């Protein structure tokens, strides 16, 4: 997985992230700024799930994007 691609294109990607994780606010997404660890933490917080689950969910989402 090449997360640099997500981070480098965050302005374009954050809409897709918002579609997947609608509980994340625009402010959350602006603060995350493409940083995977921050995205994991915010998903964990907003959805009340374990960090490992957030990590797996992000991996699944990323793989479905076809990048």
From Swiss-Prot:
Q: Which top-level group of life is the source organism from?
A: Bacteria
**Per the database entry, which stretches of residues form a coiled coil?**
none
Looking at the keywords, is Glycoprotein present? no
Q: Provide the alphabetized UniProt keywords.
A: Plasmid
Q: Which Pfam families match?
A: CsbD
UniProt xrefs under SUPFAM superfamilies: Hypothetical protein YjbJ
Q: Which family does it belong to?
A: Belongs to the UPF0337 (CsbD) family.
Q: What is this protein called?
A: UPF0337 protein msl9551
Organism whose genome encodes this protein: Mesorhizobium japonicum (strain LMG 29417 / CECT 9101 / MAFF 303099) (Mesorhizobium loti (strain MAFF 303099))
């Amino acid at each position: 997985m090449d997360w640099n691609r997500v981070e480098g294109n965050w302005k374009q990607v954050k809409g897709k992230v918002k579609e997947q994780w609608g509980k994340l606010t625009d402010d959350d997404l602006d603060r995350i700024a493409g940083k995977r660890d921050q995205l994991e933490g915010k998903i964990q917080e907003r959805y009340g799930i374990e960090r490992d689950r957030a990590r797996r969910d992000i991996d699944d989402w990323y793989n479905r994007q076809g990048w």
